[in-house]
C-alpha cells in the first residue's frame, strides 16, 4: 500500500464518529438548538444523506458550515464487485492515508447481512487468512466502521426500487455443496427477497475487533441507536480469534451482542501452528473465559472452525473437538445447549499452500460432532468468486 498525504479535510471531524450526544455538543457549541443534532442524525442514518448540503430540513447556513467544517468518510467505495446473481456485493473503501478495507453485503430471502471490517489489515497472523498476510496497517475509527453499514443501507435502498430479485433458499443443516455446485446446479429455487434494509451485522471482516475494542464498541453504540440505523444488538455478531480480555469485557456490556470464537483446532499444538494468538491465550484460558461469558450472559456462543484438507479435518480431530467442548479432555466442559460449532470449508487464497476439505470429510466431521451432542452446521459461503468469503478479504490486494 502506498501511503497518501493527509489533507486538511482529513483532519476535520467525521460526523460518523459522533454519537447523538456528541453531535448535540458540537452543534450547541455552534449556537444551534439541540434539536438540530437530532435532525442531522436522522439525515445521516435514516435518510442516508451523503453530504450535509442534501440535508434540506436544515438552514442553508448550517448546511454550508457542516460541509465546510466537518466530513463524511468514507462515503463512496472505490469499487463494488458482485457475485451470486448480485446477492453478494463487496465494496472496497480507500481511507485517509491510502489504507484499503472491504465490506460485504449478503442478501438472503429474509435478511440482509453486512460483514464489516474493524482494521485495515490484521496483526493476528492466522496462516489460512488473506487479511493476515497484510499485517496491521491501522485501526479504523468508529466512523469508518459505521460508514460501512451506511453504504450497505444505501445499497439496500437502491436495490429496493428495482423489480423483485431472486435469492437462494437456505439449505437444510445437513446440506452442503461446493462453490462450483452453486454456480452449476445449486439446490436453490427462485424466491423474492422481501428485505429492503440491513437487518444483521457481523464484525467478521478485516481485522480483530477486540484489538480495537473501544473504537469498535463506539461504532456498535452508534449503529444500535434507535434514532438512527436502529440495528438490534441481538442482530449483531462479533468474531474474535480469542482475545480473552475482550471476551471478558463483552460479558459485562449492556448490549447483548452475539459472540463467535475462531477455534479451528482441538488442541494447543495444532491451534498454535494455525493461530499464533494461541501461544498467548491457550485453549484452557480461552475456554475458561468462554465459560464465564456463558454463565454471565446465558447467550449462545458459536465456535468457528475452518476445515483445511489434511490439517484439521480428520475424524480424530472431530472427536477431540467434541471431547474438548464436553470437558472430557482437560478443561471443564461448556454447557452444550449454549454451544454451536460452525464448520467453514476453507476458501482458497492465492499463494497459500493449503487445501479445501472435500465434501465427504466435511460431512463426516459434522456427523461426529452431532453424534456427541454438539450442535453443528456447515456454512454455505457467499462471494467466493470475488474473494468476498470468509478469510479472503485483503483490501483489494492480490496475495
Swiss-Prot record:
SUPFAM superfamilies listed in its UniProt record: Radical SAM enzymes
Gene it is expressed from: rlmN
Pfam families, per the entry: Radical_SAM, RlmN_N
Example GO BP: tRNA methylation
Keyword Ubl conjugation in annotation: no
Covalent S-S links between cysteines: 115-390
Family membership noted in the UniProt record: Belongs to the radical SAM superfamily. RlmN family.
Domain of life: Bacteria
Chief location bin: cytoplasm
Function of the molecule: Specifically methylates position 2 of adenine 2503 in 23S rRNA and position 2 of adenine 37 in tRNAs.
Protein name as catalogued: Probable dual-specificity RNA methyltransferase RlmN
UniProt subcellular location: Cytoplasm
